[in-house]
């Protein structure tokens, strides 16, 4: 990579995680599908157990509560997204792997992720609409991902060069807003391909900020 900036996929200080047995993994896969397609509040433990082919007792033995199932659902999806994004950024060809190119690659990665995993938009944004209480253990997963994305955009903006640190931080925040707004528009299906539109706007922002 041209910049040498490593994209960390780890999350720190997150909620407690559950050790996964095969039955727990089946339950988590069912919960992910149901929560994402129907919403967290609309899905009960009975339905998750039935879809996974496990008993309610098994669910409670493994997870302890529906709250913890929600935590595992979001944390698992977050981990997979971070790994996917890091892989996509690492794949930017070295001669072209400038910070600006990697910023645009974030939008490309989100577009690819949404094509395969995101018919209803961002799972974190959707979950936050249902779980706004900061005391809910899943809240840390949701905000943790968004803070991580902000740090990624800001770090790449600083690496782009040609602008002072304060301007780079503002650029990072603006790129974050573009990205998150496009995710919401994707879920709402307001207009076609909002992430491609956001990428074009990001390119224009970068050109204006760095003169390249």
Give the label of every model feature segment.
Residues 137-147, 159-205, 209-212:
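Hydrophobic/aromatic-rich alpha-helical bundle segments in the mid-to-C-terminal region
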Residues 20, 28, 70, 74, ...:
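Amphipathic, non-transmembrane alpha-helical scaffold segments
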Residues 1-22, 210-212:
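N-terminal intrinsically disordered/low-complexity leader segments
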Residues 72, 86-116, 171-175:
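Hydrophobic alpha-helical connector segments
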Residues 23-32, 48, 73-81, 85, ...:
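Generic hydrophobic, amphipathic alpha-helix propensity
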Residues 116-136:
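Amphipathic alpha-helical segments used for helix-helix packing
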Residues 79-86, 101-105, 120, 134-159, ...:
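Amphipathic alpha-helical packing segments from all-alpha helical-bundle domains
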Residues 26, 30-68, 72:
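Helix-turn-helix
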């Amino acid at each position: 990579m041209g910049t040498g900036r490593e994209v960390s996929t780890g999350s720190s200080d997150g909620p407690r995680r559950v050790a996964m047995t095969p039955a727990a993994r089946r339950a988590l896969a069912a919960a992910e599908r149901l929560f994402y397609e129907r919403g967290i509040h609309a899905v009960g433990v009975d339905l998750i157990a039935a879809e996974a082919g496990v008993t309610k007792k098994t669910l409670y033995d493994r997870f302890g509560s529906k709250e913890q199932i929600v935590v595992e659902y979001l944390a698992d999806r977050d981990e997979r997204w971070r790994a996917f994004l890091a892989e996509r950024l690492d794949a930017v060809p070295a001669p072209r792997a400038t910070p600006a190119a990697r910023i645009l690659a974030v939008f490309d990665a989100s577009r690819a992720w949404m094509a395969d995993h995101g018919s209803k938009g961002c799972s974190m944004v959707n979950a936050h609409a249902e779980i706004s209480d900061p005391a809910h253990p899943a809240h840390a997963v949701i905000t943790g991902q968004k803070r991580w994305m902000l740090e990624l955009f800001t770090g790449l903006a600083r690496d782009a060069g040609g602008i002072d640190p304060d301007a780079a931080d503002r650029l990072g925040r603006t790129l974050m807003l573009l990205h998150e707004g496009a995710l919401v528009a994707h879920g709402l299906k307001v207009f076609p391909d909002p992430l491609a539109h956001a990428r074009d706007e990001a390119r224009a922002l970068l050109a204006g900020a760095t003169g390249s």
